[in-house]
């Protein structure tokens, strides 16, 4: 309904050099952030660099190099499913104490109805096989399944007709 759509907040993330939209439950028990098709997709390291977080402690440097390498891999995988009709779900999270109580489902259903009404698709990624069933329950289809460097799971899922 119109009142619910008005709760969709436009958030301008400097670190994304674009627009990210977000919705949250009243007390932020669950948060869902997503990007429209025209927003350039970057990896997490680029996100942090643009956010001017250059003072990452030295002991985190090896981890950020590994993360950057994985992000490049993930970006290549998801780009195959992104086009001018596909929104990208960047973050979907619910605080542990509020999981399995419908908070996340409420937000996801809102986004799904928005996409369906306007003829958009939605793309998301997960690194947990256990999440696949959850996303399938919303109507997402598993499009790509791979292992980064043979050990880190990576799944790309798509909602809507392609």
Feature map (PLM): residue ranges:
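Conserved acyl-donor/pantetheine-binding loop and adjacent beta-alpha core of acyl/acetyltransferases
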Residues: 31-93
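Conserved GNAT acetyl-CoA-binding A-motif
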Residues: 85-87, 115-127
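Conserved beta-strand-loop-alpha-helix junction that forms the acyl-donor binding cleft
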Residues: 90-99, 123-133, 148-152, 159-161
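Short, well-ordered beta-strand micro-motif
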Residues: 24, 33-35, 156-160
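A structural microfeature
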Residues: 29-32, 144
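A short helix-loop-beta-strand connector motif used in the catalytic cores of GNAT acetyltransferases and
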Residues: 3-23, 30, 84, 88
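Conserved acetyl-CoA-binding loop-helix of GNAT-fold acetyltransferases
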Residues: 94, 100-113
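Conserved active-site alpha-helix within GNAT-family acetyltransferase domains
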Residues: 105, 117-118, 128-145, 149
């Amino acid at each position: 309904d119109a009142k619910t759509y008005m709760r969709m907040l436009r958030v301008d993330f400097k670190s994304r050099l674009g627009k990210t939209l977000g919705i949250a439950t009243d007390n932020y028990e669950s948060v869902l952030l997503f990007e429209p098709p025209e927003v350039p997709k970057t990896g997490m390291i680029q996100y942090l660099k643009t956010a001017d977080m250059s003072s990452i402690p030295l002991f985190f440097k090896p981890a950020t190099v590994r993360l950057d390498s994985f992000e490049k891999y993930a970006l290549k995988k998801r780009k195959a499913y992104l086009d001018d009709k596909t929104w990208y779900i960047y973050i979907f999270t619910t605080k542990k104490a509020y999981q399995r109580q419908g908070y996340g489902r409420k937000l996801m259903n809102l986004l799904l109805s928005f996409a369906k009404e306007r003829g958009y698709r939605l793309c998301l990624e997960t690194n947990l096989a256990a999440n696949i069933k959850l996303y399938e329950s919303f109507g997402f289809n598993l499009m790509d399944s791979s292992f980064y460097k043979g050990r880190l799971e990576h799944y790309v899922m798509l909602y809507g007709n392609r």
